[in-house]
Every structure is written in structure tokens, then in C-alpha cells.
Amino acid sequence: GAMLSHQNLLFQARNAGSWIGDEAREEIISILPLCHIAERTFSVFLPLNFKWIVNFVESPETSFENTMEVSPTLFFGVPRMWEKMHSNTVIKINEAVWLGRIAYELALKIGGKYAEYIDAGGKPNLLLRLGRWVAEKTVFRNLKIMLGLDRARILFTGAAPVSPELIAWYRALGLNLLELYGQTECAGITTSNTKAENRIGTIGKAVANVDIRIDENGEILCRGPHVFKGYFGNPEKTAETVIDGWLYTGDIGTVDEDGFVRITDRKKDIIITAGGKNISPSEIENQLKFSPYISDAVVIGDKRKYLTCLIMIDHENVLNFAQNQNIPFTDFASLSARPEIVDLIGVEIENVNAKFARVETIKKFKIIDEQLTADDEELTATMKLKRSTVEKKYSSLITSMY
């Protein structure tokens, strides 16, 4: 276990004003298990320091309903939560009458253009401001009420990579969804985008009083009062992780001329194909998860001739699709095996393949025919597929694709 000192935690709580701001007494909702350092930061440490109101969900299954009831002003969620909100909205829009669909698409284009101007530090012209106002009154306000985000001042996502397109979608709606970065060994947050400085596709700048640099191997290193004291009972691992005060995060990335940090992938997850091509699987996986029908994905291909993928389907949305198309099935496994569902996922994968170079495209895929929950060993507490566990458990399924 990682040993965190009282000083580590106090630093995070007192330093948060530099990247959150303290203009209001926030009301938040706590969804993730408190064993997760980011959730403990947002639901315990920061509320104690800033006197926020904390609401706890009744259960993971009621999290979206509880969010609608509370309508938090500040909200931290993992990418899967934001992906699910997006996919639920897309499905509902697709089921709406033609006039509703047209209004949504038009409003989204206007909102996206408006957000691009704002994020670039520009000033939208009068016509665009007027269009954005109409879009807010006719479309966006209702969507935000439906999502429980109508009072949201600031939203954060972290704990896993997120698609830039997903953040852009929320920005188009007028919601400040900001990506941040940290880990248990840093007692919480190391970098963050802010309302004043936000660059989509990055994890923001180093927060106040924290230093960031990239070593000769491309690994992100950080230094500051938030760095932990070491791993309990494991001085060897501690010595490998913290050298001369610098924490070796295990993430590969870059820092641009303005100080914004961009993560490529986990060092251990980089795929090197049989042809010697280095590929970041998370970039492909993020694009796949932007589909309303794909809950998660694991790209395979290390030391192999081509890339394949294991897909975890979004049960609710795929179930609705099957019912609307009158596709017969008996259980989750039979639903996953239906040719119509395989074709549906195949189309989504081809749409993603079109965005990447040929060597980075998915050549074959298989659907995991089990409905996984946080209690299963394949998933983390934040609903991420554990790559090594999945590759080991489904090794025969992977082998069948080569």
C-alpha cells in the first residue's frame, strides 16, 4: 500500500483553490468508492477544507437518478460515467421525432463552434452569441436538466484516459468538463485544466507548487509536497519509484510550450507490434468508447502482426437496439452472439478505424459475452477493464483471432 502523510493530504486540500477556485460553496455528489484517492479527495478532503455539502448516492445503480435529484454544482466522475451520460443522451435523441433530432444537431454545431472560440480565448460574433442563446433555451437547458447538471459550475474527469470528442460534446452543451490527472502516490491531483486555462486533449498544467518534467524515456515525473512516503514494507519498490524527490509516474507523455501535459499511455501498456510499430492502445480504445454501444474495449497486438480487440458492449443501449429491431435473444451471452449485434459493433469499429493509420486499425474483434460488474476481477472500482487480467482470462478468445 502507498503511505500518505497528513502533510500530503493537507497540501492537496489547501492547494485545490488554485485549480478549482473558491467562488462558491459547492454541493457535490459522491459516487465512487472512497478507497479511490480521487473520490476521497473530492468527497472528504476538499469538502472538509472548503465546507462543501456532500451527497452520497444510495447505490451505484441509482447514481444517475440521484444526480438528477441533487443537481450538483461540482462533480468529479470517471470517464465511464461521462461516456454513459453521453450515450444515453444520443440514444434518446435518436429515438426522438425528426424535428427534435434536427434541433439537437443544429444546437450542437452552434454550441461546439461557440466553445471553440471561448477555449481559444476569442470572442464569438453577435450572430453566434445569439444562436448559442437560442440553443441554450430550446435544447441545452432541457438536456442538462435530464442529466442532472443544470446547476453544474464545474465538472472534472480523471482516473482514466478520456476521448477529446467526449469533452468537446460537453463543452458544446455549455458544461465545463475539465480533465485532470493524479494517482494514489501523489495523494490526489498533480495536473488539471481550469476554467481559465483549458486545452482539450491534455490533462492540464501542473497545479500550484508542483513540478513536472519528462525524462529521457518520455516518462512523466513529478515533484512536490504531495509525493507519498513510499510503499509500506517495500523499500525496493519505493527506491525505484521515487528518485531524488521525483516520482516516476509510469505514464508516457509530453509537455508543450505552454506547460500543458499530454499523456500518450501507460508505459507498460504501449504495444510494439511484430513489425516494430509503437502503438498507444488507449487512443484507439477512447475512440471506441465514444460509441453509445461500446462500454469498454481492450486493444491487443503486442508482438503480433496486427491489432485485435475485446469489446464490452453497453448492455442497456444494445438491449434497446435489439428490442427496437425485434432481435430474439434469451440472455446476455445470446444477445452478444447475435449476428446483428456483431454487425452493429463492426460498423462502430470501422468508423473508428477510419480515423487511424492502417497499422493502427482493428482487424478482428470479439465481444465479451459476460455482463461484468465492479465485483468481478476484470474491472476496477472505477469500472475500467484491467488489461492484464482480461488478457489472461480471455487468452483463448484472443488466440482465436490470430
Q: What feature does the model see in each segment?
A:
Residues 197-200, 227-250, 285, 325-336:
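Conserved ANL (AMP-binding/adenylate-forming) active-site segment centered on the GW(Y/F)…HTG consensus within
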Residues 278, 292-296, 317-368:
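Conserved C-terminal helical docking segment of ANL/AMP-forming enzymes
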Residues 55, 128-133, 145-157, 162-218, ...:
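Conserved ATP-binding loop and adjacent catalytic segment of the adenylate-forming AMP-binding
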Residues 206-273, 290:
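Conserved ATP-binding/catalytic segment of the ANL
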Residues 1-13:
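Conserved AMP-binding A3 loop
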Residues 252, 257, 291-317:
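C-terminal boundary motif of the adenylate-forming
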Residues 10-27, 34-140:
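Conserved AMP-binding/adenylation subdomain of ANL enzymes
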Residues 296-299, 348-402:
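Conserved C-terminal "lid"/linker of ANL adenylate-forming enzymes
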